[in-house]
Amino acid sequence: MAKVNTQCSQPSPTQLSIKNADRDLDHVENGLGRVSRLIISIRAWASRHLHDEDQTPDSFLDRFHGSELKEVSTRESNAQPNPGEQKPPDGGEGRKEEPIVVDPSSNIYYRWLTAIALPVFYNWCLLVCRACFDELQSEHLTLWLVLDYSADVLYVLDMLVRARTGFLEQGLMVRDTKRLWKHYTKTLHFKLDILSLIPTDLAYLKLGVNYPELRFNRLLKFSRLFEFFDRTETRTNYPNVFRIGNLVLYTLIIIHWNACIYFAISKFIGFGTDSWVYPNTSKPEYARLSRKYIYSLYWSTLTLTTIGETPPPVKDEEYLFVVIDFLVGILIFATIVGNVGSMISNMNAPRVEFQAKIDSVKQYMQFRKVTKDLETRVIRWFDYLWANRKTVDEKEVLKNLPDKLKAEIAINVHLDTLKKVRIFQDCEAGLLVELVLKLRPTVFSPGDYICKKGDIGREMYIIKEGKLAVVADDGVTQFVVLSDGSYFGEISILNIKGSKSGNRRTANIRSIGYSDLFCLSKDDLMEALTEYPDAKRALEEKGRQILMKDNLIDEDLVAARVDTRDVEEKVEYLESSLDILQTRFARLLAEYSASQMKLKQRLTRLESQMNRRCCGFSPDRENSEDASKTD
């Protein structure tokens, strides 16, 4: 039995070689598997690392976003598929495609407005011209047919876009296609769009293609052109120039239509039948198409602007048309004068306001007999402000915006500046919002001292543009030059305990040229810190560390100095107690005055009763009882 077991337990050389080969193959496969898994994991890690590097948010900016954005970003990062996973061909199970809805405030919608405004403008300019001038229609018939039906295609597409254009309801964009279609069909635009797409040009089959007036219903799409003008005026940086151009365009279109109607009336009455209508086309100089249109345009311009003499009308219909033209011309003239006058006033309003400030300062300096040198410096300072467009009062401009938008604009404008200050690097987002709203732009002239050694520090400054010099007491020797992005005075406004310099300036800083600085006052900082006590303590600790690093703090002063926070709290408590006492005293004084008044009235009544008794009058019983009660 043992022998059998021994024989069975000893494999043959062939079996051993096969097993060794299988074992080696398993080792190779396991090694390749581990290597492949390692390569896949390294590639996944590298892709995530590169993705994180590409989209690493600024930690300073991150503090201005709420937790909702962070949750969204976390969900998006968790939703990234693993390298080994395969997406289903339908894009994911249970995922429903959202319908395409156009946001009316998006750039895509504005670009579509630009595209649809072109065929509308084409129809308004050329349909009437082709209907009145036969040569223009017949000589370029193929071109007009292509343009007409291309415009019709855009009209149809515009109806589809309008049916998918979202609208706001309770502040949210409605994206339900059924509600969008229902909302669109209830508007006047839908009715006009339907009327503008009625295929009236099917009458071409019976009348011929030389009747473009059959397509006049395409003019009902004018609302798209007006909407394009309104949105362009809102988006452009030169609204006054655009308004003037828009007004000129409207005037030219009216003159163009009037010229075409004049030529059509002349054709109806008969060319050359009288002095008012267009001359006889049998003459070669009046037979050309260009001469026909230019002559009609010239007549229309003279009539509507009433600046020239035209041949007087002869027939009744001619008189009626000229009267209507005169009335339209008066309206055009009044509109142009009024609009251009208001636009010019709006364009010159900043200059007029700024010039009024300069004039008032000049009058004051002349009245106070200011030296010519100082007066010249003041005028140059004003010139610098105007030349560099620094005359805008930011608070006045932004006063109509809500606080949230004010904060976002301030963050967008001043965030890069505030990031450069060390003590504000790790502040709370709410405190940073408060601080950026309190930054005030300040401009210094050449040679102006921003601060001098020993002055009490009430502001800190951040250099936006310009150069400042740290000078010696003699005002000549320069130690260092501060440029864009530098800041100073941040420690003095914190009033840190134990500072060797206290809250006084330790250097003389002077402006070399014109310098633009941002100023943050101590009062504004403390007002913002009242709602953030933890941030206040953190700022003070950070300022104390900076002073200790520069060996500018005295530990003995820290130990000996009374805690200013306790003193401030006591002062605040005393102020509140004083307010309460004043209120109580005022109430007691009012009660005392009222009681005195009642007492005087009672004494007066008693005196009158005593006088009556002394004079022999017998008062009634009720009065005597009242007097006894009063006694």
Swiss-Prot record:
It comes from the Eukaryota. Residues 1-111, 161-187, 230-239, 345-631 are cytoplasmic. 3',5'-cyclic GMP binds at residues 489-490, 492, 505-506, 550. Disruption phenotype: Progressive degeneration of cone photoreceptors. No cone photoreceptors were detected in mice older than 8 months. One of its GO terms (cellular component) is cone photoreceptor outer segment. One of its GO terms (molecular function) is intracellularly cyclic nucleotide-activated monoatomic cation channel activity. It is found in: Cell membrane. Residues 134-139, 208-211, 263-288 are extracellular. The keyword Calcium applies. InterPro entries: CLZ_dom, CNG_cation_channel, cNMP-bd_CS, cNMP-bd_dom, cNMP-bd_dom_sf, Ion_trans_dom, RmlC-like_jellyroll. Prominently expressed in retina. The record marks 333, 337 as: Central gate. Residues 567-610 form a coiled coil. Residues 306-309 are annotated as: Selectivity filter. Glycans are attached at residue 280. The keyword Phosphoprotein does not apply. The chain crosses the membrane at residues 112-133, 140-160, 188-207, 212-229, 240-262, 289-319, 320-344. Residues 1-18 have a biased composition (Polar residues). Its main location: membrane. Belongs to the cyclic nucleotide-gated cation channel (TC 1.A.1.5) family. CNGA3 subfamily. Pore-forming subunit of the cone cyclic nucleotide-gated channel. Mediates cone photoresponses at bright light converting transient changes in intracellular cGMP levels into electrical signals. In the dark, cGMP levels are high and keep the channel open enabling a steady inward current carried by Na(+) and Ca(2+) ions that leads to membrane depolarization and neurotransmitter release from synaptic terminals. The C-terminal coiled-coil domain mediates homotrimerization of CNGA subunits. Forms heterotetrameric channels composed of CNGA3 and CNGB3 subunits with 3:1 stoichiometry. This is Cyclic nucleotide-gated channel alpha-3. The gene is Cnga3.
